Structure formats: structure tokens, C-alpha cells
A protein has these predicted regions:
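Active-site nucleotide/adenylate-binding loops and adjacent lid/helix of ATP-dependent enzymes
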Residues: 97-187, 191-238, 370
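Peripheral (often C-terminal) accessory segments that flank ATP-dependent C-N-forming ligase machineries
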Residues: 290-379
């Protein structure tokens, strides 16, 4: 019996959990990882250690793979086009992926197709920033590196002209955006297959702490049904217009005046979709596997009225395993997902999921477990 081989570029926790989702289907994974200690490299049997930025390494890795996918968006698109020319399906393809790699390209395309975004402009020096601010509501202005930023990195909130020079010292292109007056952050997660089948998960609320996702609530509490539907349709439109294959996460601002604006795109499984592992009929990881293999997509509906995901960040309590006894005894329904990473302060090392009919109870259980695992809660 022959099953396809999925080539996964990137060895982080997203690759690890995508691999886990493929196991029940008998799907084989081949992994290109930076080091043998990476999260996914600990669990995938066929691992190649190498540099994803090297075309020769990518070509050697792709031999024997039926399709290539990713757990990050950083692979050079020219290299991916070379793989496609070699006859290897790449999903999502480079023409789609560039919109998750380059914020300037993303903003231009979304504006072209009529998707609402914050006011923005590519800027080359502090004078451009001052001019951009003057044309709008003034300072503060948000500056972002066009490529490479994540979890709050590569983002500056500039309160005046005297701060506008800081982002340019790195010598990389910068995008200026208005500072959006938003009430909360949302995320719309969708999955699309090569032949165009698409499914949408419920829109979630994503709560950030110091620029890093802390808590996700599914579905987003008290979100007007019209706005929720608009967010889902917006994400499905983006996936179709950009030709996305696989999972697409659309990070959104819900503004104080009732609008929804696109913040960022991610073309891979996403932190805002981790709740689906235990809270949806088909997880984001399982549907990503199905999509890249062009299998029929699974049901994205939730299993419970409420699901909460809370990230477990590294703290001063390195022996997290010893915390399992308390967490599991206190909450037999708790789902713990650890990534096999060394515990370092502030590092994402796992997450917990809880679900139920009472939102306050679901959130309390998830936050208690995550805090106890980290060591910030001791009783």
C-alpha cells in the first residue's frame, strides 16, 4: 500500500502538530529542519538537516516528496518556483506565499481586491514617516519591517518625529501604518484546496500580551453575527484571490467604530487555530494536510459552545512535567499540548485547550492550567 509523502519545510511546533494530524491517515512526512533538536525533528522519522535558503538543499530534500508545504513563510519564492519547475507541487505556491512574506506586497494586493486595511505606505526615511503622519491623524504611527517580523518583533509604535529614525537603522524596507483604534483583535481561519473547496472556522478573539498571542477564545464573544460573517467571507475571498492552498489565518482589528481591518496574513497553521485540535470536528492541522493533498476537507464546526486556548510560555519553572499531576487532577477535561522545546523565559513551549458551556469557567480552567505549568500560579 502506497501513501503520499508530504515534505515539510521547517521543524517547529506547527510542523510537529501537522505531522501528528497526518498519522491517523497514514501520511508519511519528510522534514527539512535546522537542527535535530527542533520540535518536529523529535517526532518525524525522516529528517533532513539543512538550510531552507539553499536551493541545492531544497532540491535534494524534495526528491521523493509528493508535495511540499511549510511551517513558516520564509523560503525564497524563487527557490519554490524552481521546485515547481522540477515538477514538485508546492502548497501554498510562491505566488500566494509572497503575500505572507512581504507586507508591502500584501497591502497592495488586498487594497486592489477591495479588502479593508489600515491606511499605509512604504517609507524610506524618517521624513516619509513625518509626511505620512501629517496626511492622516498625526502621530503615533506604526512602523513595520516589510519582511521577517513576528510576535511583536519588527514592529515600532512611533510617538513623534524624534523616534522615526529607529526602524531605519537596520537598513530594511519599512511599512508605515496608521495606529488603529481597535477594541480587540480577531482572527479568521480558513482552509482551501487546489480545486477550490474551502471551509471557514468560527471567527475567534485573540488576546495579546507584549505582542505575543496569549489567549484565544472560540467563537469570539459578543461578536455581531453580521461582522462575523463579513470576517469569514473576507478570509475566504483573500484565499481565493491569492490562490492560497492550505491553511490561511487572517489577523483582524475590530475597530471602535464597527469596522474590521486586516492586520496580517499567515499561510500555514496558526496560533489562533490551535483551539481546533480539541474544539473543532476537524483541526486546522488535519485540514491543512487534507488541503495540500487535495483531499476533501473536514468539517470545521466547533464541538462545544466555547473553547479557550492559552499559550504556555517558559518561565522560572523548568520542570513542567511535575505540574501535570495537579493540572490533570484539577481538570480531567484539560488538553495539554507540549512542543518538546527547552524552557526559556517568554518562549512558547506549549498550549492548553479547554472547552464547555460556560465561558467564564472555560477561561478560568485554561488560564489556571497555563499559569500552573509556567509556575506563576502555585495553588
Amino acid at each position: 500500500m502506497t501513501f503520499p509523502v508530504v515534505g515539510m519545510i521547517g521543524g517547529g511546533q506547527l510542523a510537529r502538530m501537522t505531522h501528528e494530524a497526518g498519522i491517523p491517515l497514514g501520511i508519511r512526512f519528510k522534514l527539512l529542519s535546522d537542527t535535530p533538536q527542533d520540535s518536529a525533528a523529535q517526532v518525524v522519522s525522516d529528517v533532513v538537516i539543512g538550510d531552507y535558503r539553499d536551493l541545492g538543499t531544497l532540491r535534494a530534500f524534495a526528491k521523493g516528496c509528493d508535495v511540499i508545504t511549510f511551517d513558516h513563510e520564509h523560503v525564497p519564492t524563487d527557490h519554490l518556483r524552481a521546485l515547481e519547475a522540477d515538477g514538485i507541487p508546492v502548497r501554498p505556491g510562491p505566488d500566494a506565499l509572497v503575500h505572507a512574506q512581504d507586507k508591502g506586497v500584501m497591502r497592495a494586493k488586498l487594497t486592489e481586491i477591495g479588502v479593508p486595511c489600515p491606511r499605509h505606505r512604504l517609507v524610506t526615511d524618517p521624513a516619509d514617516v513625518v509626511a505620512f503622519a501629517a496626511e492622516g491623524a498625526g502621530f503615533p504611527v506604526v512602523l513595520k519591517t516589510v519582511r521577517g517580523g513576528y510576535d511583536g518583533k519588527g514592529v515600532w509604535v512611533v510617538d513623534g518625529p524624534e523616534e522615526a529614525a529607529d526602524p531605519f537603522r537596520a537598513g530594511v524596507p519599512v511599512l508605515a501604518e496608521e495606529k488603529v483604534d481597535y477594541v480587540r483583535e480577531l482572527a479568521a481561519n480558513v482552509v482551501r484546496s487546489p480545486h477550490g473547496q474551502a471551509v471557514a472556522y468560527p471567527v475567534v478573539e485573540s488576546q495579546q500580551v507584549n505582542g505575543v498571542c496569549d489567549t484565544v477564545i472560540a467563537p469570539a464573544p459578543d461578536l455581531d453575527e453580521t461582522l462575523a460573517l463579513k470576517a469569514e467571507e473576507m478570509a475566504l475571498t483573500i484565499a481565493k484571490e491569492l490562490g492560497v492552498v492550505g491553511h490561511l489565518a487572517v489577523e483582524l482589528f475590530q475597530t471602535r467604530d464597527g469596522r474590521i481591518l486586516v492586520n496580517e496574513l499567515a499561510m500555514r497553521p496558526h496560533n489562533s487555530g490551535h483551539w481546533t485540535q480539541d474544539g473543532a470536528i476537524t483541526s486546522q492541522f488535519a485540514n491543512h494536510v487534507r488541503a495540500v493533498l487535495d483531499l476533501p476537507l473536514g468539517d470545521p464546526r466547533p464541538r462545544a459552545k466555547w473553547t479557550a486556548m492559552v499559550n504556555v510560555l517558559g518561565g522560572d519553572y523548568p520542570d513542567m512535567y511535575s505540574a501535570y499531576l495537579h493540572c490533570m487532577a484539577r481538570d480531567p477535561q484539560l488538553k495539554i499540548h507540549m512542543y518538546g522545546k527547552d524552557v526559556k523565559p517568554g518562549r512558547k513551549v506549549g498550549h492548553v485547550n479547554t472547552y464547555g458551556d460556560n465561558l467564564d469557567d472555560v477561561l478560568e480552567r485554561a488560564r489556571h492550567a497555563a499559569g500552573y505549568l509556567r509556575g506563576t500560579i502555585t495553588d
